[in-house]
Amino acid sequence: VLEQLKENEKNYEQTLLKTLLPAVKRSATITKRADAQLVFCIDVRSEPIRRAIERLGNYETLGFAGFFGIPIRVQEFESGKTKDCCPVLLKPRYRVDEKPYEVNSFLMEQHQQGKTIKTTLGKIYQELKYNFATPFALVETLGAWYGLKMVLQALAPSYTKKTSHALNHLIAPQLQTEPSFELDEDNLEHGIALSEQIDYAETVLRLMGLTSGFAKLIILCGHGSTTENNPYASALDCGACGGNHGGTNAKLLARILNKIDVRRALEEKGIHIPMDTLFYAALHNTTTDSIELYNLNTVKVLYPNLVNQLRVDLEEAKSSNNLERGQKLNSAHPEQDIQRRSQDWSETRPEWGLARNAAFIVA
């Protein structure tokens, strides 16, 4: 049996090398500057979307650990909770806070008022639920509404999710955030010193092999999963981020690499980043293969055609992957089915996770 396994492995290895060789020869002859470069986590779920994107245009994709080399503890803006966005074997060295990004005072006030309303209603509900005299009245009052919600969640999960999201946004508009990471002289536990920012920037760029040939637009893609009522949800998120979404880590590195002081220091270390190169962050949803581009206000002005085409191609790559995955799931309507799986609270395995990983290539 062991000899048969070894023979099967050898045959697979030879077949894989024959498949990869033409792609290696093609990549060695490419000299044209890429329109955009996208950096994904070295996760098996990133590979299909990387292949799909590279087929669609003058794009190049790269891989790196999803925490992008910076071990941080993040304080979330919305919940106020902290999370460690680094591998569990590492201790976070820095604390960064999420702050609203380019928000006017009216929108900020509306968000805070809505947040206060939701917090107050939550406290009232908890008081009524656990008070000695009121639980029965609470059930009689809200039971029918909760029953209706359960039926809708079971029969129309996508509609229920959209409605819930719309109501939440109406009460407290969702704000885009960015990490606040500059070193605080009054609180040395918060932020990252400029010298350390430079060191991390150099290390990450060299490790991912990106020291020349920079595109105008470089997207750092963290990743995470969407699932409902799943006790194993964190296992589907980014392992390099400690079972959290990797969006904040991507935003942090993008902001560091866009800093003039950091680029000047990198120049002295032999890494020249062109002035027309911009780094931006994104989040790859591994359940649906959608990619959300963060805070692209500036880049829309500088490269509107490039950004618009990238959005179109990312959507096409998503559809292509959904179709490929849907065939394996025997689904008649792959996109709708995969979207439903991410929102269905009865779905214990909304995505393929790390299954079907046959080989790991270090190059």
What are these regions (language model features)?
Residues 1-188:
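N-terminal extension/subdomain marker
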Residues 42-48, 220-228:
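Gly/Ser/Thr-rich loops at beta-strand to alpha-helix junctions
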Residues 1-30, 45, 148, 152-207, ...:
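Gly/Pro-rich turn-and-neighbor structural signature
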